Curated annotation (Swiss-Prot):
It comes from the Bacteria. Keywords: Amino-acid biosynthesis, Aromatic amino acid biosynthesis, Lyase, Pyridoxal phosphate, Tryptophan biosynthesis. One of its GO terms (cellular component) is cytoplasm. Pathway: Amino-acid biosynthesis; L-tryptophan biosynthesis; L-tryptophan from chorismate: step 5/5. This is Tryptophan synthase beta chain. PROSITE patterns: TRP_SYNTHASE_BETA. It holds the Pfam family PALP. GO terms for molecular function: tryptophan synthase activity. It comes from Neisseria gonorrhoeae (strain ATCC 700825 / FA 1090). Its EC number is 4.2.1.20. HAMAP family: Trp_synth_beta. Its cofactor is pyridoxal 5'-phosphate. Tetramer of two alpha and two beta chains.
Length: 400
């Protein structure tokens, strides 16, 4: 796929994306777009971004050959891009560093964020402390119960965590509240969106900050294996870790790209979070147009996933576009497959993955045996699983 360019000047990726917000937010988004366009062309901005990624986050994150897991499965060699080794334990911090630098450049003293699994909340609280800003994090009440360790982490870092009791009490509702708050305090507040979704320019901006993942991986895989992987795979909720891995590979036609949505209890049930795989129609949510789980009246449907971070009814607009142009294949891993992959990676490699990342590992577990021993699968291990041990223990009937 040569000459891939997106989004267009209106923030559209094909027919997805754009700017669907109330009039009151338009000036804030235009101000943000202008600031980002200036920063994007300022070498000093990127130099500072890279410095922080190196000295604060600990990048580059390594690629690691999961040799014992590969041998156990028989077939393709599985390599992991170790985003779990970043400061704060996931890929989220790549993006929050970039947005915090932008907030500071715009003179904003306060940041707000939404969070599902709590990883983006922790990463936002972390950079707020790093840059001396106040931070409020909106989190669904159900997610707070699932992710208590991360809630406490955010508070330790000085953030105020605001529980959201409306709707499904998960990520979607947290995002609604955060957008409402931004409208109310747009003058002094910067909204750090945690995924490659939301109104323009957020999907492009988040991608640009996250594509450090794929850029590093390309150089590292070349050095480690003398070639690029046959397949690069990542889990997809809103889709920031996935677009970070995929974007630098889009024009590399020999590399198959696979996005793994949350299959929950199965896409033939109502309990999943897989808008593309389940054939959901296009809708508008949180300021952008994309595939969206909704009923015949356009009401957003409830979602289910064992992982709080994939529990989202929409998907980032660039993913919808990459699906439309058939550059990326989207599929699912169900809860039980993700949990099996979680166990396998723990036992064979001594790595406890996030339940989100376990969905991508599950694809490799299922497909590596069907491939040749000389073939290579690169899995984006987007985060570590410390935050999920309570969930997993509960599912195994173990009291912690």
């Amino acid at each position: 796929m040569k000459n891939y360019h997106a989004p267009d000047e209106k923030g559209f990726f094909g027919e997805h994306g754009g700017l669907y917000v109330s009039e009151t937010l338009i000036p804030a988004l235009k101000e943000l777009e202008q600031a980002y366009n200036e920063a994007k062309n300022d070498p000093e901005f990127w130099a500072e971004f890279r410095r922080d990624l190196k000295h604060y986050v600990g990048r580059p994150s390594p690629v690691y050959h999961a040799a014992r897991l590969s041998e156990h499965l028989g077939g393709a060699q599985i390599w992991l891009k170790r985003e779990d080794l970043n400061h704060t334990g996931a890929h989220k911090v790549n993006n929050t560093i970039g947005q915090a630098l932008l907030a500071r450049r715009m003179g904003k003293k306060r940041v707000i964020a939404e969070t599902g699994a709590g990883q983006h909340g922790v990463a936002s609280a972390t950079v707020a402390a790093r840059f001396g800003m106040t931070c409020d994090v909106y989190m669904g009440a159900d997610d707070i119960q699932r992710q208590m360790p991360n809630v406490f982490r955010m508070k330790l870092l000085g953030a105020n965590v605001i529980g959201v009791d409306s709707g499904s009490r998960t990520l979607k509702d947290a995002m609604n509240e955060a957008m409402r708050e931004w409208v109310a305090r747009v003058d002094d507040t910067f909204y750090i969106i945690g995924t490659a979704a939301g109104p323009a320019p957020y999907p492009e901006m988040v991608r640009d900050f996250q594509c450090v993942i794929g850029n590093e991986a390309k150089a590292q895989m070349q050095e480690a294996t003398g070639r690029q992987p046959d397949v690069a795979v990542a889990c997809v909720g809103g889709g920031s870790n996935a677009i970070g891995l995929f974007y630098p590979y889009i024009e590399e036609e020999n590399v198959r790209l696979v996005g793994v949505e949350a299959g929950g209890l199965g896409v033939d049930t109502p309990d999943h979070a897989a808008p593309i795989t389940s054939g959901a129609p296009i809708g508008v949510l949180h300021g952008f147009r994309s595939y969206l789980m909704q009923d015949e009246n356009g009401q957003v449907l409830g979602t289910h996933s064992v992982s709080a971070g994939l529990d989202y009814p929409g998907i980032g607009p660039e993913h919808s576009h990459l699906h439309d142009i058939k550059r990326v294949e989207y599929t699912v891993a169900k809860d039980d497959e993700a949990l099996e992959a979680f166990d396998l990676l723990c036992r064979f490699e001594g790595i406890i993955p996030a339940l989100e990342s376990s969905h991508a590992v599950a694809w490799a577990v299922k497909n590596a045996p069907k491939m040749g021993k000389d073939q290579v699968i690169l899995v984006n291990l987007s985060g570590r699983g410390d935050k999920d041990i309570n969930t997993v223990a509960k599912l195994k009937g173990i009291e912690l």
